[in-house]
Amino acid sequence: MKIWVDADACPVVIKEILFKAADRTKIAITLVANHHVRIPPSPFISFMQVSSGFDVADDEIVKRIEANDLVITSDIPLADEVIDKSGIALSPRGELYTKENIKSRLNIRDFMDTMRASGVHTGGPPALNQTDRQNFANHLDRIITQFKKTQ
């Protein structure tokens, strides 16, 4: 298992949780973004900068993931592609995307895009709170624990 992070929009506090998990579990984490992201010195943490452009980081992640790799993203279409490649997709809020829920999440996303395109102001998601951070950390620990049991 390798952990990939769609780092362009990943909150700093979530990256910090991931950095600690990488050192604690010795699982490799790669952050992918189209701008520089500071990472701590660690043999388990790397950064890949891609060129600017629509979905360039997403496409790079999809190209490189393997079955059972974990991808941290709030991008619903990316999560869908990860699931199609037998990967695991987890949002920074701790929502585990699955075959059972990804299509409805895509439909909601598409509906909201349509609303925004027609001029309706839909607002953004609420700020990440302590419950979201705890939910993310708990799901991350469960996924890593399951992976370690299979090793």
UniProtKB/Swiss-Prot annotation:
Pfam families: DUF188. Disulfide bonds: none annotated. PANTHER family: UPF0178 PROTEIN YAII (PTHR35146:SF1). Belongs to the UPF0178 family. This is UPF0178 protein CPS_3584. It comes from Colwellia psychrerythraea (strain 34H / ATCC BAA-681).
